[in-house]
Each structure stands twice: as C-alpha cells, then as structure tokens.
Amino acid sequence: MNTVRVTFLLVFVLAVSLGQADKDENRMEMQEKTEQGNSYLDFAENLLLQKLEELEAKLLEEDSEESRNSRQKRCIGEGVPCDENDPRCCSGLVCLKPTLHGIWYKSYYRYKK
C-alpha cells in the first residue's frame, strides 16, 4: 500500500513540475502568437481602411455627378410665384401674369407653355 502511495506521489510531483515547464512554454508561445496576431490585425485594419477610402471616393464621385445633372429635378414647379425678369425658368414653364384677378393680381406665376 505504501508503494502505491509513494508511486502516486512521485507521479504527481513529476506531473506538476513538468506541467509548470509546459505552462511557461505555453505562455511564451501565446505571447509570440499574440504578437503575430497583432501584425495580422494591423494588416487587416489597413486593408479595410483602403477599401473604405475607395468606397468613399466612389460615393463622392456619384454625388458630384448627380449635383451636375440635378438642376431639372430640383426645379420649382407650376403655380409657384416667380420674377418676370428672371430667365431661369424650368424647361416647359413660363413666367406669366395670372389671368384671374384676386390676391395675386400683381404677381407672376409659372405656367406650362
């Protein structure tokens, strides 16, 4: 019975002492992997940043193209007061004096041609 206890104690001591060495090795290995992982994270972060910058540039180009061609879309429509001397009327609309008298007898309004 004593030999079993001594054997068990010896195996236990060996396992603990070897396990400690493995812990130190594991800790060092984990530090190395973490440092490598940080470099991978930096690489991935830079790659993502480049993609986002490209996407932003494309969106800004689309916005500028839209603003060049959007004058007709933002044109004030029919039945809106206008200035008779202002030539910037939308295509298909003319600035005319209303035919009916009322509260707007001195104003000019936009009508279809």
UniProtKB/Swiss-Prot annotation:
Keyword Signal applies: yes
Keywords (A to Z) from UniProt: Disulfide bond, Ion channel impairing toxin, Knottin, Secreted, Signal, Toxin
Subcellular location: Secreted
Principal location class: secreted
Covalent S-S links between cysteines: C75-C90, C82-C95
GO cellular component, one term: extracellular region
Tissue: Expressed by the venom gland.
Lineage: superkingdom: Eukaryota
Example GO molecular function: sodium channel inhibitor activity
Signal peptide, first to last residue: 1-21
Prosegment residue ranges: 22-74
Location of the region described as Disordered in the Swiss-Prot/TrEMBL record: 61-83
Role summary: Probable ion channel inhibitor.
Similarity comment: family membership: Belongs to the neurotoxin 14 (magi-1) family. 01 (HNTX-16) subfamily.
Domain notes for this protein: The presence of a 'disulfide through disulfide knot' structurally defines this protein as a knottin.
Name of the featured protein: U11-theraphotoxin-Hhn1w
Species classification: Eukaryota, Metazoa, Ecdysozoa, Arthropoda, Chelicerata
